[in-house]
Amino acid sequence: SLTLWAGQTKMPGNRQRLVSSQALQLVDRSQVNSIFNIDRDIGVHLHGQFQVGSVVLRPIFAFAKGEGRNIIANNIGGFSYTGKLEILPFGLFESKGDYFEADLKREQKPKLSLAASATYNEGASRDKQTGTFLIDTAGDYMANNLLTVLGDVMFKYKGFSLLAEGAFKQVMLKSGQSLSTTDSTLVSVGGKSYQTGWGVSAQAGYLFKHNIELAARYTRVVPDWSKSFTGLDEYTIGLSKYVVGHKLKVQTDVTLIDEFDNSDYSLRYRLQVEVAF
C-alpha cells in the first residue's frame, strides 16, 4: 500500500523523534535525538508498506522545504530530500508497538524493526533542522548543505524492550571551505555552528508484574568541529509505574553526565507524573 502525506509533520528520521513524547520509557529523549534529529518540516511524504512472506518493508520518501518547523514564507536555501527504509523481519508489532517505548503489550513472539534514513538538506540556515538561525559576518543567513544519516533498532519480547540509535551529520564542504573554527562560512558571527558529529544511544527495559519497569540508557555524542554542543557520555537508570499505559504513569530517572571538556561529573535527577487525554 502507498499513502501520500502533505503539510507540516515529523520528518522520517530517527525512531525516538517519531515516538510521541508521551510514549517514552524514560523521562525524556536521549541527547542523540536532541542534537541530531531532523524534526519537522513542510513538504510531501510518500509512505509505503509491503509484505514479503513474514517480512514487512516500509519505504518512505520525503521532499520538504528544508527550513524546519513553522517557516511558511521564503526559503533561504534549497530543499531537503529524505529516504528511509524500515524492515520488520518478524512481522508487525502488536498495536503499532514499534512506535511506543516499553513492551506494554508483552509481545508473545520476538518482534524486531530495523531502520535507516538519509537526509540531504540544501542550503541549511539553522544549526540543525530546527533551532538557531546562523548569521555570517556580512549579516546574511548562512546556507550550507548538510547530510544526516540515522539508524535504529527496536526489539520487544515478553516484557523486554531494546532501542538503539546511531546518528551522523556533516557539512558537505563547498570549494574553498574548510572545517576550521575561523571559517566564516561555517561559524556564525555569534560563534555558533552547525550541530555536526556523531552519536550513539542504547536503552533497554524490562516490564515486571503490575506494570513496573526498570530501564537503563547509555548515550554518547561527539562533535567534529561544532561549536554548538559539548561531547559527553550519559549513563541513565530509570523506574516507571504505568497506571494506564503511557496515558497515566509515574517516572523517575537519575543520570551521570561526563562532559569531555570537564574533569568533573554531574548528576541529574528527574521525577514526573504524566497524564494524557
Predicted regions and their residues:
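Beta-barrel outer-membrane channel/assembly domains of diderm bacteria
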Residues: 1-2, 40-59, 136, 153-158, ...
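Detector for outer-membrane/organellar transmembrane beta-barrel domains
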Residues: 76, 86, 94-223
